[in-house]
Amino acid sequence: GIVAGVATPALADRVALLSSDLTQRQLLDVLQSQHQVCWGTETLRKTVAAMAEGLSPFGHQAQVAKVLSLLQQAADAGGPRKIQLVVGRDGIMLPIRGLKKYKEGATATVSVYSRWGKRLGTVYLGQMPEELQISLSDELTRLLTDVLGQWNGAPLRLSYITDAGFHPTEYFESVLCRMLDPQRPGGYLEWEWVVDYYHACQYIGDLAQVIFGPGREAYAWAAKMRRTLKEKQGGVFRVLRSAGQLRAIRGLVGEESDYESAYNYLRRHSPWMNYAERRRLRVPIGSGVTEAACKTVFSQRFKCAGMKWGIESGAPILALRVIALSGIWPEVRDAVFDSRTTEIPQLPINSTTQT
């Protein structure tokens, strides 16, 4: 049928896919120059919203199928280690009209790594600014639960790689640590949290500035400690010992509170900073995939020059964008159109003709 009363299914599909990447003005120009379609902004927005509403309910199952397909690909390829399912989440500030308190959009990634430590693919989730990021957490939990419930292959290494911000920490403690193992009734899944190595390095830099002040000494010590943190067993404790000894011997150039803040961050999160062991197992130690998702999901589409968004106007674009970036657009589109196809019943053919 006609989508939103204005577009054929083929045109609506084209508009929806382009809207996930192009600005409104760019898309209207493309429609006019390539398709001889002259629309106004209201018609465009109505079509995009209708397509997002139609596609979104089918996105979840397509993402589940995509992750399961990647897991099977990893299983078929073989290798010396476990297949890895790696999850991350992060946030990015968005230019939202009329919203003073909550402006942080949130994204999550679910990636599959081969037994050799190579990333095979990623699916993306996104949420416009929302208090406590409840919708993103629910969507991510549903995706992980369905994937792990349907996977009957080789055991997986489950990794959660984030910074140690409030939302990532709360999700690990309240959801992942309590996630039941579908293969072991009454048991729990063993998620390994890895605090992003590069965030940890920022705190080493802070310690260097407080201990030495600006200059070569601070740079050299921080570089050495970053290598120690990454390459040595118990690296974080070596860093803490070195910082403590230097403080006792030479005192501090900077503020005591700055030293305590950086030192306590490393000490508090030390159980999730065993980077040498993670590297040995070919587990990623940085949240680069999720950091990049903040840019690909949000920045490249929502933070162009002069842009301001409303929550409701941004949601359809975001829904379409995560479907496109996850590489499941054809599957979702076909599922939508198949669900709306009505077969015309065949009338019985009489063997004799009445006159």
Identify the residue ranges that each predicted region occupies:
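Catalytic center-proximal scaffold of phosphoryl-transfer enzymes
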Residues: 1-355
